[in-house]
Amino acid sequence: MAREVVIVSAARTPIGAFQGGLAGLTAPQLGSVAITAALARAGIEGKDVQEVLMGCVLPAGQGQAPARQASRGAGVPDAVGCVTINKVCGSGLKAVMLAAQSDRKS
């Protein structure tokens, strides 16, 4: 039987300007800010996360697995699976779609 999928929290990465105040931070570091905020807003801890699906428009130069780097920076345990979705403008929406499809099967 399929379970209902709900969004309990949302946060996005900070938006900056080229060579602006956020220039010294990597995309995974900014992702950590978003994950930390989403967890706080939902009232859950990193240990309660089952999977991290995160869109990343331009992963070049970010190192391996930007979603993993972001989740670790937010205190999510290493045992939690992470997926980086590289789909340019649609990566965030694709993350929501994959999460909904994955959860409904369990």
What is each model feature region?
Residues M1-V80:
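Conserved "HGTGT" condensation-loop signature of ketosynthase/thiolase-family condensing enzymes
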Residues M97:
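Glycine/small-residue-rich loop that forms an oxyanion/phosphate-binding "nest" at active or ligand-binding sites
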Residues K105-S106:
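Conserved small/polar residues in nucleotide/adenosyl-binding loops
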Residues C82-S91:
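Active-site nucleophile and cofactor-binding loops and adjacent substrate-binding regions
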